[in-house]
Amino acid sequence: MKVTLIAILTCAAVLVLHTTAAEELEAESQLMEVGMPDTELAAVDEERLFECSVSCEIGKEGNKDCKKKKCKGGWKCKFNMCVKV
C-alpha cells in the first residue's frame, strides 16, 4: 500500500514539474518570436533616457527635487536624470 502511494505521488510530482517546464519553454519561445532585436531595444533605451532626462530637468525647475518626477518602465531618477534600473 505504501509503495503504491509513493509511486502515485512521485508520478504526480514528475507530471507537475514536466508541465511547469513545458510552460516555461513555451513562454520563452513566444518571447523570442515577439521580441525586438537588440539594436531596436538599444534605440528604445536611448529614447527613454533622453525623455526621462528632459522630464527630470523640467521637474527640477522652481526648486523642485528631481525625485518628485517619477520615471516609469524600469527607470529611476538619479543624479538629476533618469537611469535604467
Curated annotation (Swiss-Prot):
Residue positions assigned to the propeptide: 23-48
Chief location: secreted
Tissue specificity comment: Expressed by the venom gland.
GO molecular function: toxin activity
The entry's keywords: Disulfide bond, Neurotoxin, Postsynaptic neurotoxin, Secreted, Signal, Toxin
InterPro entries: Hwtx-2-like
Localization: Secreted
PROSITE patterns: HWTX_2
Keyword DNA-binding annotated: no
Residues spanning the signal sequence: 1-22
Transmembrane segments: none
Cysteines joined through disulfide linkages: 52-66, 56-77, 71-82
GO CC terms: extracellular region; host cell postsynaptic membrane
Family: Belongs to the neurotoxin 12 (Hwtx-2) family. 02 (Hwtx-2) subfamily.
Protein task: Postsynaptic neurotoxin.
Name of this protein: U4-theraphotoxin-Hhn1j
